């Protein structure tokens, strides 16, 4: 047995530093000092930063390549940083000019040009005024002569055209800041891993096809007037007097030029000027996306770009992992409350006076003159009176309900109440009472509970409603805070049969708000379908709808049509129908009664405000599903039941994608090329009249100017992109042009744009083969190539570095507690185990960091102040790699079906050991049989199982051993070797001794012990050579219930097992194949004869001991006597 093998030191481990917790460990400020174990790479990076050399980092994932790239950026000087501007070119508009200035100057230059443009606006105004004045004087002096009047009109028109053109030219002359380095405290670090051509090399925008559905909400400012409008309504209104129209293939485009008007649209950075609006008519496809986890939805053409947390992405590429940038919007503020009192002006006056009074302290008389407000009003305010609306605003502010933003977590509760008010709720015209009627007392109670969560305790009454035809319960409150709050948020006021219903704009900002609104609306007005059997099959009967009466169809129809459109995002089919009922109209939102639509509805609309209605609905669906086996849907019963069970558990899909073909789309073009639609930050068209230089977008190579460009897996870039990258590295400049041949951006090509970056490329050994030879030559000739180490010596100094690593990970994560000393010891032991070599520590620190974070999460869950050893041990069990989980499942499954056997002996069957991934072992059963050769010329070794090239060659090498000891021609045999159920694949030669043992057992018909497993490579001389992953292989054998493991003598010091595992296994190191057979074969006379023959056949030096025993000495290794008792 392996004596003293890889023993874990139970005594206090020398960590190179004394501490109680990692709180005491200082974490270096500079990233370069945080790099662990890669001393050679650190020195190279420091030299490369000083000399501005490129670096190629080759190594396994998780060894710190990207960290070294970021560290280099810290080492570069910031004094050399520059801003890059792009200017229009009067001589050739498709070749914008490029200018570089010291960092921080770019913004000043752009602001200066904008100031000049505004001055030009003033000149334009005075010029027009002068022309009007001259024309007016001429007409006056000519006593109204018609010819003079006609000439004057002509002069005015010409002046308007000239000044409008002058305005556009002054705006077009404002440069665009491509790269802004103002305020930077370190050189740029740009990670271009996986970037496409446009993102890496720069692009020129052209997106006239990128359009919206038109249902989106935008915020528009015209002069001092600011309002929330639907995009479709805004564009249609602007196109009442279009500037022009044309055809784009089969699509008719109508547009309006608004450059001469003072219209602005809200974007992420405030309001920006609107340039154009356009409408496109013709068949077009919209991609509709709902992400409930990240709470956003959008409906745009597939190539429409949106801003995600990872940069710009086309809508067609958006996945459930993408987070679209959202900007919080103010939904409710003081002025909106004031408007419910009709005190908009008075509220504004009070705020103006209050600021004036706090600043000057002047009395009301003087203030009245300076502010143009009535003296009597100011006298009352000076004495402490306030507008009624202000008192209400102050009360709502105490409840933190003002200002109310789109990110407020209470909005869903507000939305569900609002939905109920749109159904069976009411606010009277005088704003005196708010009421809600339901036949279900529980619904009333939930309505009240929700209001209390928002407003606290308030006065109300609940009583039987004797005015209704059926039995119902009435809730009523007179609380003016509640009434004014919901009126300001868009609740209908007065008799709903006479009121025009409009879906409040803020409800459309997020899918969660819309679903909450629908919950309240359906809980009040919705009807539940009934299950019924018919001769032709089963179906839902009765009504499944929301219906309301009105005296004017247009007061309800658009409201329900809009709801139906938004429901389609979730795959819920609904249509609107209007029926005449006496002197009124009944507008009905009718839902499809197919089982799929019913389940979709229940999945997303929980009907939480009306528990009885939900229970009734679920019972009807259960009755339907119970009858499905007898219907045409019998083949889908499991699918439908599974969907229904998820609904009952409250589960729902988080990412829903649908497509819709529409005939009209809408868009707007702003000065900055972006806007907020439904609160989401999106790009918009830059193609219609936008100057070429404003459509230029810098690439990552330009943003990395004077900094570091990091590209991991650089070989994944196309050869064309690698060639372009090489050109940029050589020239230190690279022009920007449109990357798409179909785009008008392809006609634009800027002057060369500076891109003097240091390239830090990374990858694995395969990267070298796939890299463009010239690119690698450039790096090698003008920089360094570094191989990243995967282990470092296990010394106290390096253990101290791992202590620092743990402290760094805790600080970097920011959400886990610090580690105690014994917990750090366990992390170091895990680093020893993962190194796979005695006396070494792993440098795959990303994986080790995963253990640190998992242990920290466990400590947080337990409410601990510090992470302890027990937390780390639990983390190692909980956070197993995927390969380890597969290996455990593999072993469990194989044992269950007796594919892995751990008792008795069998001929030709051996338990080999293999590795999945990097750190996970599996037991690999191997079987061999010998049969007469099928070919008269020669026998074959036939191997089955999913083997790699190296594994196949290793099997063939076994035949050399067999031929030598057998002493006869084995060509008359076919030897079949099967790797049982190796669907996961096998590569490497570590199964060589297992194959040799199985084949020899089959040839000699000697059973192999099934409680023995083995791993090791085999040379043609019979030597057992070292292999990798010995520790995880032994652990797999232990988990499978095997008692003895054979390993190469060379790997003896690489075994690292915990004490509890050491007790469960006997480990035997060997140097030769005869030693393997000695242990593995079942004891018999045939075995003794076989081993003697094998030993005699091995090309090894022999000698006799004084006692007469024959020894085989193998290069100074262990010696095994030939004795009968050896087993």
UniProtKB/Swiss-Prot annotation:
Matches recorded under SMART domains: HintC, HintN
The active site consists of 990, 1033
Query: Where on this chain does ATP bind?
Result: 59-66
CDD domains recorded for this chain?
A: Hint
Q: Which family does it belong to?
A: Belongs to the peptidase S16 family. Archaeal LonB subfamily.
Subunit field text: Homohexamer. Organized in a ring with a central cavity.
Q: Indicate what this protein is called per its UniProt record.
A: Archaeal Lon protease
Taxonomic source organism: Pyrococcus horikoshii (strain ATCC 700860 / DSM 12428 / JCM 9974 / NBRC 100139 / OT-3)
